[in-house]
Amino acid sequence: MVKSFIPLAVAMLFAGAPLFACEYPPADGVKIADGATATEAEMLESQQAVNAYRRKMEAFVDCLGREIEALEEPTVEARQMRNLRHNAAVGAMEDMAERFNVQVRKYRARLEQ
């Protein structure tokens, strides 16, 4: 068993697979409460979910950086792919923050009435 594992491990090492497995965090589990009707507890729960998503996305972006740094000589294509993935992650975080902030403004406007 061990003898068959060693050649497989060596083959995988030189197969060109990325050293890090940077997985894009899904946003589908993040629920943002409707600020027009939400309670304070629901808004705080939404804030916690958005912050948790942001932390996961920041870890993803950090992983992308480590992944490209691990390559001895990254190709132009590898750098471009890293930049695309990085920019998509930043855009997703900005979109999530804006969606949450819209609901916060609705919530605060409702409280001021």
Residue ranges and their predicted role:
Residues 21-22, 75:
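Generic structural signal for short, solvent-exposed loop/turn connectors between secondary structure elements
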Residues 1-9:
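Bacterial N-terminal signal peptides that target proteins for export
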Residues 15-18:
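N-terminal signal peptide c-region/cleavage motif recognized by signal peptidases
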Residues 22-37:
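Short N-terminal segments immediately surrounding and downstream of signal-peptide cleavage
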